[in-house]
Amino acid sequence: MYKKIFFTIIILSMSFRSNSEIVFTDKFTSNNDWKIITDQVMGGVSQGKFNYKKIGKDYAIVLTGNVSTKNNGGFIQIRRKLNNVNLNQVKNLTVQAKGNNEKYFVHLRTTFTILPWQYYQSSFVVGNNFKNFVLPIKNFKRSGYLLPK
C-alpha cells in the first residue's frame, strides 16, 4: 500500500511547565538544536525538512514533508535533546502549533528509553490557526510495557 501525504506543521513555541513556572522554553533561534529523522533509517522512503520562520516578533519551526507507507515506513519527525535542563518537576508540555487539520504526536524519551522505538507519547490535532496544546506529562502513554509508568 502506498499512501503519500504532504503536510506542514508550524510550532511557534514549546515549553515545559512545573505548575505555573516555566522550566524550559524553545524560541527556535538555533539551527543546531533540532534534527530531522525520517523512516529512511529503517528502509522507508518518506522525506521531510524543517526550517525556522519569523512570525511577528517570534520565530517558529516549520516541518514539511511527504510521508509514505511504502517499504513499511510512514514517519518524519524533528527531534532535540534537552541538556542541562531539570525536568523532574515538570507537569505539562505546552505546544503552540497550527497545521493541516491532522493529528500529530509528541514523543518524550528518558533515561529509561534505551531502544530507538521506546518513547512516551501524547497527541494533538492542529487546525489552520495557532492554538495552545497543554499536554500533561502524566497522560503520556508508554510505547511498551517494559517502560516504567
Which residues are covered by each model-predicted region?
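Sec-dependent N-terminal signal peptides
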Residues: 4-14
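Beta-rich carbohydrate-recognition modules and glycan-binding surfaces
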Residues: 2, 16-149
